[in-house]
Regions:
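Cleavable N-terminal export/targeting peptides
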Residues: 1-8, 12-68, 346-364
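Subset of outer-membrane beta-barrel
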Residues: 66-364
Length: 364
């Protein structure tokens, strides 16, 4: 979910009230698009959009910073968006995303993210680790998160509840080499030299799941809203609500899975609704609708491998998924869409202790 707020945008904000507001397009970007709407040459338009993206990234006087990364296949790893979901099964999970947003537009967001979490035996819960790198225009964002989810005792109906907390280190940097679209030197919001800053923050999440039947969760990111050092930027608090339900259509062979994710910073709200079908616990395909932004078909495979040899046993699950967001916003004339790839490895290796037996020679 990418949104940039510029405190100096007054006339453009009033103009936007006459149109349907798209929470995925910043106000400076929208203003630039409208100003260039009379252009007929496609190549010029793409260049202008790229300039607008760079401008939007840098207008940050007492503004909220870069939003959290957006992923279409978020339902493949709920713990990436709610630390309370970490360790909701007995496997260790390692998941990687790559997302190329608005393909073909120079300076558009490119996001890489790794999320790992594992259940442990020495405490009632799980630990998580998340790394992500986000590049957009002349702006670069890096986040490192370490988290723990405490698992409450299983409820009488078989549901499990996790309460989690992330501690994060957030780094942001700007490159001053950019193309201005107006008299930028008179605007103190725009840095004239390269700049960078860091901040620490926390995330919080509560998650409930009943086996493979349903789940629900509520989480917050940037809870502390700590201003970044050397930059006049405050990452804004985000709220996430997620929920899902699985409907068996043909026993366990065919399962209809529904997922919903609502994201808001109490000013702009975005909604993701996904429906997909899992066949034979191996092949899945579905469709995601994102409010005011895109329709995204997605598909993937998952393969489970169980093995036992002597005193050792293992269980592994491999997943690969891909999606393509077909843009439905104002950018649909300038980009074919957004490509995303998801890869996951979940595993558990066990060694059964050898039972020592003692015999009395008298009874041999």
């Amino acid at each position: 979910m990418f949104e940039f707020r510029n405190t100096r945008s007054t006339q453009s904000e009033r103009q936007a009230l006459r149109h349907k507001e798209n929470p995925y397009i910043s106000q400076p970007l929208r203003s630039c698009l409208e100003a260039q709407s009379a252009e007929n040459q496609r190549n010029k338009m793409i260049r202008n959009i790229s300039i607008c993206l760079a401008f939007a990234c840098l207008t940050v006087v007492t503004a909220f910073g870069q939003q959290d990364p957006q992923m279409t296949q978020w339902f493949n790893d709920l713990a990436a968006f709610n630390i309370g979901a970490a360790g909701n099964d007995d496997l260790t999970h390692v998941n990687i995303w790559y997302r190329d947003q608005w393909s073909g537009v120079n300076g558009a967001p490119v996001t890489t993210m790794l999320n790992a979490h594992t259940k442990v035996d020495f405490v009632p819960g799980a630990f998580g680790l998340q790394l992500y790198q986000d590049e957009i225009g002349q702006e670069s964002n890096t986040m490192v998160k370490l988290g723990y989810a405490y698992h409450l005792p299983t409820l009488t109906n078989g549901a499990h509840i996790g309460i989690g907390l992330n501690v994060s280190l957030f780094s942001k940097s700007f490159d001053a080499n950019w193309i201005a679209v107006d008299d930028w030197q008179s605007d103190p919001a725009i840095p004239q030299t390269n700049g960078s800053g860091t901040s620490t923050d926390i995330d919080f999440g509560v998650f409930m799941r009943k086996s493979n039947e349903y789940y629900a969760g509520l989480s917050m990111t940037h809870v502390a809203e700590v201003q970044m050092t050397s930059l006049n930027i405050i990452p804004t608090r985000h709220y996430y609500f997620m929920g899902g339900y699985n409907y068996p259509l043909n026993g366990e062979e065919l399962i209809l899975r529904s997922n919903v994710l609502a994201k808001t910073d109490l000013n702009a709200t975005a909604l993701d609704v996904n429906v997909n079908v899992l066949w034979n616990n191996f092949l899945w395909g579905g469709l995601t609708w994102r409010q005011g932004d895109a329709v995204a078909p997605s598909a993937g495979i998952q393969y489970r491998l169980s093995k036992k040899e002597g005193i050792t046993s293992s269980e592994q699950v491999f997943k690969v998924g891909a999606s393509f967001d077909v843009t439905t916003s104002e950018l649909n004339s300038y980009t074919p869409g957004t490509a995303e790839v998801f890869v996951s490895w979940a595993f558990k290796f066990l060694t059964t202790p050898v039972e020592n037996k003692y015999a009395n020679p008298r009874f041999l």
